[in-house]
Amino acid sequence: MVKIAVCGAAGRMGQRIIVAAKEAGCTVSGALERPGHELVGQDAGLIAGCGALGVAISDDLNAVVDGCDVLIDFTTPKVSLKNLEACALKKKAIVIGSTGFTPEERALAAELAKDIPAVLAPNMSVGVNVCFKILKDVAKTLGDDFDVEIVELHHNKKKDAPSGTAVRMGEVVAEALGRDYNKVANYHREGICGERTKEEIGMQTVRGGDIVGEHTVYFIGMGERIEISHRAMTRDMFSRGSVRAAQWVVGKAPGLYDMQDVLGLR
C-alpha cells in the first residue's frame, strides 16, 4: 500500500487529494502546511471531510517526507522546488501539480529529479492529457494551413496566467509544427498590432467566478474551423489523477516524468 503525503493539506486541492488517496486505498501518511497555519495539529482527515485518519497536519517538511513513499504537491513553483529538493535528499518520489514554472525552474526540477522519480505535470486530468495527444496528431495533419488560437478560462482566484495547461497545449502544437513556442506565442494584442503572422500561436485568458478550468484550441482555416475543448466540472479529476500518478511513480527509475508517461500515451 503506497504511503502518500500531501503538501498544502488544508487547501481546497489538498483536501480533495486526501479524500482521493483514501478512496484509492492508499495510506495518507502525512499532511503538510506552511508554518503558522491555523490548522496545524488538526486531523487531516477531519479537515478534508473524510473522517479521522490519525494524521495531524504538520509544518515539519522533513518529518512528513521521512514518513512517506511519495509526496503530492500542489503549491507554487518556489515551494514545489523546495519540496523536490527535500525529497531528493531523502530519496523519496514526488508528484508536482503546481503551475507557472519558468523554463529555468523547470530545468532545475529536471536536475533535482536525476536522483529520484518525479512527476511534473500542469494538469493531472486524464481527459486533458488525451487532448494533448489529439492536439499533436491534429497539428501534424493540418500543418501550416490553419491558424492556431488558444483560449483558457479559470476562476477569479487563479494567480498565474495563462494556465500551465494552456501553455502546454501551445507547446504541443508548436512542437508538432516544428516551431519554437517561446518565439511564436502571442499573449497580447491591442491597438494597431498588424496582421497575424502565419507562425504565431495566440493565447487568450479569461478569469471570473468559479470556473474550474476550460481550454479550447482553435485550428482556423479558410471556410472551416476545428475546435478541441476540455471543460473541468470539478477538481476531483485533478486529485484522482495525482493519486494515480503517485501510485505509478513509486519504484520507477529516477527522472522527470509527466502524465503522458503515467497514462502510457507516449
UniProtKB/Swiss-Prot annotation:
The active site is at residues 154, 158. Its main location: cytoplasm. It catalyses: (S)-2,3,4,5-tetrahydrodipicolinate + NAD(+) + H2O = (2S,4S)-4-hydroxy-2,3,4,5-tetrahydrodipicolinate + NADH + H(+); (S)-2,3,4,5-tetrahydrodipicolinate + NADP(+) + H2O = (2S,4S)-4-hydroxy-2,3,4,5-tetrahydrodipicolinate + NADPH + H(+). GO terms for molecular function: 4-hydroxy-tetrahydrodipicolinate reductase; NAD binding; NADP binding; oxidoreductase activity, acting on CH or CH2 groups, NAD or NADP as acceptor. HAMAP family: DapB (MF_00102). NADP(+) binds at residue 34. It is an enzyme of class 1 (oxidoreductase). Coiled coil: none annotated. This is 4-hydroxy-tetrahydrodipicolinate reductase. Catalyzes the conversion of 4-hydroxy-tetrahydrodipicolinate (HTPA) to tetrahydrodipicolinate. One of its GO terms (cellular component) is cytosol. Keywords: Amino-acid biosynthesis, Cytoplasm, Diaminopimelate biosynthesis, Lysine biosynthesis, NAD, NADP, Oxidoreductase. Gene3D superfamilies: Dihydrodipicolinate Reductase, domain 2, NAD(P)-binding Rossmann-like Domain. Belongs to the DapB family. InterPro entries: DapB_C, DapB_N, DapB_N_CS, DHDPR_bac, NAD(P)-bd_dom_sf. One of its GO terms (biological process) is lysine biosynthetic process via diaminopimelate. Pathway: Amino-acid biosynthesis; L-lysine biosynthesis via DAP pathway; (S)-tetrahydrodipicolinate from L-aspartate: step 4/4. It is found in: Cytoplasm. (S)-2,3,4,5-tetrahydrodipicolinate binds at residues 155, 164-165. NAD(+) binds at residues 8-13, 33, 97-99, 121-124. The keyword Membrane does not apply. Its EC number is 1.17.1.8. It holds the Pfam family DapB_C.
